[in-house]
Regions:
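Anionic group-transfer/hydrolysis microenvironments
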Residues: 24, 90-91, 111, 126-128, ...
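Flexible, glycine/charged-enriched surface loops at secondary-structure junctions
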Residues: 207
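Active-site nucleotide/adenylate-binding loops and adjacent lid/helix of ATP-dependent enzymes
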Residues: 1-108, 113-116
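C-terminal active-site "lid" helix and adjoining low-complexity regulatory extension at the edge
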Residues: 166-191, 198-203, 212-245
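Short acidic-glycine loop/turn motifs at beta-strand connectors
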Residues: 36-41, 114-119, 150-152, 213-216
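Glycine-rich phosphate/pyrophosphate-binding beta-alpha loops
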Residues: 29, 128-134, 224-233
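Protein kinase-like catalytic core scaffold
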Residues: 19, 121-123, 219
């Protein structure tokens, strides 16, 4: 939500110290910032924005304001309100994910479909691993997708890096296996996605980005009403017809 007051914003920041702020209507990690509270100012730890092309013209000045370092809590609050930014707790991912890519949370995209009789099902699931030191894991330029076997929770296929043509069966930064990677507590991840699919029945097709926290619990980061069904085809090198029918 973006309807928080300055006192609520400050209370949240003081509780968690390190927070995430992100626009409520963007994609691919654009405009995300990791901020750390230091006294009465925030230090910008890292950003999901790659350059000025990732922010709208009217927000360019605000982008540079945050990008350049320390800002007062009031200035950051004003920036968030002006640009409809959400504020979130900074989440530490489980060690099995950070071992593969320590810079990002490495969420799991679980795409669900709600049938006419209101029965949820999972169409497909895929790991999102960041690389190149990026904090976001769903950016086309800095993400490796791995298709997950829904029964075993293991990665079976990876997508092609469109910039280089490489297929990374091992993570290019850490050298850890991507193909064969076993997701932690995957049954809980699936259960959470199926439960979430019932919350907004008007949206029958949603791609849930779910994190496995450091304590092993699953938590939804966001839901995407444009879940990128082409991801399945790009990763599996197969069509979706047999999956959807």
């Amino acid at each position: 939500a973006t309807d928080y007051t300055l006192d609520e914003f400050m209370g949240f920041a003081e509780k968690y110290k390190r927070i995430i702020i992100k626009p409520d209507n963007m994609y691919a990690g654009i405009g995300i910032y990791v901020l750390e509270l230091s006294g009465k100012s925030f230090h910008v730890i890292s950003s999901g924005a790659r350059d000025d092309t990732d922010v709208s013209a009217e927000n360019t000045a605000s982008y540079h304001m945050l990008k350049d370092g320390y800002e007062s809590t009031k200035a950051v609050y004003d920036f968030c309100k002006m640009n409809n930014y959400c504020i979130e707790e900074y989440i530490e991912g489980h060690r099995v994910y950070s071992k593969v890519s320590p810079s990002s949370l490495n969420t799991i995209r679980v795409t669900t479909y709600l049938s006419d009789d209101k029965k949820p099902s999972i169409i497909f699931a895929a790991n999102q691993f960041g690389y190149k030191g990026c904090i976001v894991d769903n950016n086309d330029d800095s993400c490796i997708w791995g298709l997950i076997d829904l029964e075993t929770g293991a990665v079976t296929d990876v997508d092609i890096d469109t910039a280089t043509g490489n297929i990374y069966e091992k993570h290019p930064d850490s050298g850890q296996d991507i193909v064969g990677f076993k997701n932690y507590n995957f049954e809980a991840v699936k259960k959470l996605a199926l439960e979430a699919a019932l919350v907004i029945p008007e949206c029958r097709l949603i791609g849930w980005d779910i994190a496995v926290r450091s304590d092993g619990t699953a938590e939804i980061i966001e839901g995407n009403v444009t879940p990128e069904l082409d991801l399945y085809q790009a990763i599996s090198h197969k069509g979706l017809r047999t999956v959807l029918i």
